[in-house]
Amino acid sequence: SNMWHAGVKGVTYMACNTDRKSLNINPVSNKVRLGTEGLGAGNRPERGRDAAIASLEDIRRYLMESGCRMVFITAGMGGGTGTVAAPVIAKLAKEMEMLTVGIVTSPLVSEGKRRWKQAMEAIAQLEQNVDALLVIDNDNVVRAYDDLPLHEAFSRADDVLSTATRGIAEIVTRESDLVGVDFADVAEVMRNCGRAHMSVTSACGENRVDKVLKASLCSPLLGHQEITGAKNILLNFSVPDSDELKTREVKQV
């Protein structure tokens, strides 16, 4: 729902959940209730997995009718539904030859060993069924905003998930008068790339390019990950029409 409220253009949303109440209050118009009971998975992974498998034909039908070429699968890892439904849905999308990107959050260490173990097992399964996987460490995000009240820090973690999805989606959907990046470019970089990392930052004023490049390497999205061994890098700069990139800034990039 956070991503829907963010209003990313050119993206269609589908909400999947075992919990009828959660789906009813979700603002997304396209919804699939996983399974038939509608009572939630109760933090029981096997129940969430069975529910997702039971609803695969509904999801397949929607993906075919939507005509999409790229699928983002977002979920919070460690619970009962998203943890096990995400790999199941990802496998379906990959089998349908869609560029499949997983963007998930890992639980806080303080949430307990059982939840952490469930999350790590699910992330490993998801990685086998997507082209690219971004894992956002909630501990890193909360640590970056440790001066905020706890509920606001968790809200920022949700914002990071939305920002990561928006960042990739807008590379494909946003038009550019300079060097255009289209779906084929994104597919070439992300197809079967495995674990990926992403950073989204902003800057303004003097030396804005230098500022944004340095800030990108310190983003909560990256945590402590090194990108020196990356095989491919996809860069996208968005600037207002009134203050477009200068020639020297393009050379600097």
Task: Give a label for each model feature.
Residues 1-253:
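Tubulin/FtsZ superfamily GTPase core signature
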